[in-house]
């Protein structure tokens, strides 16, 4: 595939995919789900979330989600995935190779609990399955 596919990419799909990842992260790391254990394992003071720096974190997360959605759409186009299932599979392969594989041993080297890996990797697994499926059918 050559670079000409850039003109045919659905930029709205990339934006919606990034928004889904960002909203999923807001829910995943909220007090309703995993905020307490995640913060405790990282030694984060819950009061930190009330500071101005939280805004910069949210903005940088969304920008990263935009980049990830753009790259994921490239993988989907290159693989010619065109159904929800094949797109989710591309998302799974991306998660396995680029999220789980490097982060699991890194957590071991850093002496971090497996539960922390499971929370973080679980977020990316769900996010990449959903956005992979979405981008494949709405590319």
Language-model-detected regions and their locations in the chain:
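Juxtamembrane/disordered regions of integral membrane proteins
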Residues: 1-139
